[in-house]
A protein has these predicted regions:
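Hydrophobic/aromatic side-chain positions at a characteristic register within alpha-helices
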Residues: 51, 58-59, 77, 173-174, ...
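Short, charge-rich amphipathic alpha-helical segments embedded
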Residues: 24-25, 35, 63-103, 190-208, ...
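TPR-adjacent "capping" and linker segments in tetratricopeptide-repeat scaffold/adaptor proteins
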Residues: 33-48, 152-164, 212-225, 302-312
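Conserved small-residue packing positions in alpha-helical repeats and bundles
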Residues: 54, 170-172, 177, 187, ...
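Alpha-helical linker/edge segments of TPR/alpha-solenoid repeat scaffolds
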Residues: 20-30, 92-151, 171-174, 206-236, ...
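Residue-level recognition of tetratricopeptide repeat
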Residues: 46, 80, 162, 179, ...
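TPR repeat positional signature
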Residues: 43, 47-50, 166-168, 173, ...
């Protein structure tokens, strides 16, 4: 019995036991025609148009075109996110000082008692950097194909974030007798929707097919996930060097993916109401923060149906023990300190640190060896500050009670703030 997306109808299929022949190539080739820098011209179209057309074809049971356009829309979505991340990352450090306005503003000359550099005008400096960064982004986007077509609505983007296209793709694959991809698409959707009854029933049907397990793959898997799984398997087999090698590659790849994720959050925004200047800026930034705060959880692997809790900390946990087993305490101690950044109450890791410190002379450890690794500190600081800013906004920037505002203004007036 297989269920269809959209109406939730389950159809009893009286078919001979299907064979697992992949008519559309390996399930690993979901993005085989995808290239960020040289996207195929014949596929370049508005993301929303491709997606809506694919859904229309699904409604008319035109399964080949459903598959074609939904796959294209997935590649277009990846292109858009990669393009947003590319431009925002490359323009993230641009400042107004780069165009020579640092030392001479408004005709006031250096050396006079009135001389001021741009850095002394806090607001002008901030918005000068904003203008320069905007110029950089404009130039960058003009050269990328993803921005040459109309941009998708927020609702469509959110559907892709929820992996909704795979709900329709899995049935279209099934109807085109591409069971390997149908199984992979169903699994890909279920990873984010483990309680979806319709897809759970479909997956149960697929699993009843002999040799189906080999096709249970996440079509949106990231490189660091594969490296992490390999590292854990090596760890469980006590292959410490292999585990360390793969885990040390997984860490920077995760941080790179995380950086790209938060950069991609800085895309376009739909303005729904007009506000004063600063409240409008704050609203936009809070929306961006909300997106960025989802990156860590969205990038956390789901293995065997279970989320890897405290993923970054977990990688350092594996590393510190593997290094210790190789008697490489100079690398084990910083990993232990890095783990404690994210879980400072972990008693086992605290005991490990006490043990390392007690034997520091034996292993020739300095104070530097008991500090977290720089990339761990950077990730911790970014995620912590993002959460603090968002919490502040939720606490103080929601619609105020009129009486509270009056009391606050009274305090300002009493303090001669105006």
């Amino acid at each position: 019995m297989l269920c269809t997306a959209g109406d939730g109808v389950c159809v009893i299929l009286r078919l001979p036991r299907p064979k697992l022949h992949d008519r559309g190539g390996s399930v690993n080739t979901q993005y085989e025609r995808y290239s960020f820098r040289s996207y195929p011209r014949d596929e370049l179209m508005p993301l929303e148009s491709a997606y809506r057309y694919g859904l229309d074809q699904y409604g008319t049971e035109n399964w080949p075109d459903t598959v074609n356009y939904l796959e294209i829309s997935l590649r277009l979505y990846r292109l858009l996110r990669d393009s947003e991340a590319f431009c925002n990352l490359n323009c993230s450090t641009v400042q107004m000082a780069d165009v020579g306005l640092e030392g001479n503003v408004g005709g006031i000359k250096d050396g006079s008692h009135q001389a001021r550099s741009l850095s002394e005008f806090a607001e002008l400096r901030v918005f000068g950097d904003v203008l320069k960064r905007t110029q950089c982004l404009k130039r960058c986007k003009q050269g990328l194909p993803a921005f040459r077509k109309s941009q998708p609505s927020r609702e469509v983007v959110e559907e892709f974030q929820r992996r909704e296209p795979y709900k329709f793709l899995q049935y279209a694959y099934f109807k085109t007798n591409n069971l390997p991809k149908a199984i992979a698409a169903a699994h890909t959707f279920l990873l984010l929707h483990p309680d979806d009854e319709m897809m759970k029933r479909n997956m149960a049907y697929y699993k009843s097919i002999p040799e189906s397990e080999v096709h249970i793959k996440d079509l949106e898997t990231k490189t660091y996930e594969t490296l992490f799984i390999r590292a854990v398997r090596a760890y469980n087999g006590e292959n410490w060097r292999t585990s360390i090698s793969d885990m040390e590659m997984a860490l920077p790849d995760f941080f790179k993916t995380f950086e790209e994720c938060i950069a991609a959050c800085e895309g376009s925004r739909e303005i729904k109401e007009f506000k004063d200047f600063y409240p409008n800026i704050a609203d936009h930034y809070v929306e961006v923060l909300k997106c960025k705060l989802k990156c860590e959880s969205n990038l956390t692997p789901i293995i065997g149906g279970f989320v890897v809790e405290k993923f970054v900390a977990t990688m350092y946990h594996y590393l510190q023990f593997a290094y210790y087993k190789l008697n490489d305490v100079k690398n084990a101690a910083p990993c232990a300190a890095s783990y404690l950044l994210f879980d400072h109450d972990d008693q086992v890791m605290k005991q490990n640190m006490v043990y390392y410190q007690y034997h520091k002379d034996k292993w020739e450890l300095s104070d530097e060896h008991f500090k977290p690794r720089p990339e761990a500190v950077l990730f911790y600081n970014i995620t912590t500050m993002q959460k603090e800013l968002f919490d502040f906004a939720m606490q103080h920037l929601v619609d105020d009670d009129e009486g509270v505002v009056v009391e606050y203004l009274d305090e300002l007036l009493e303090g001669n703030a105006f």
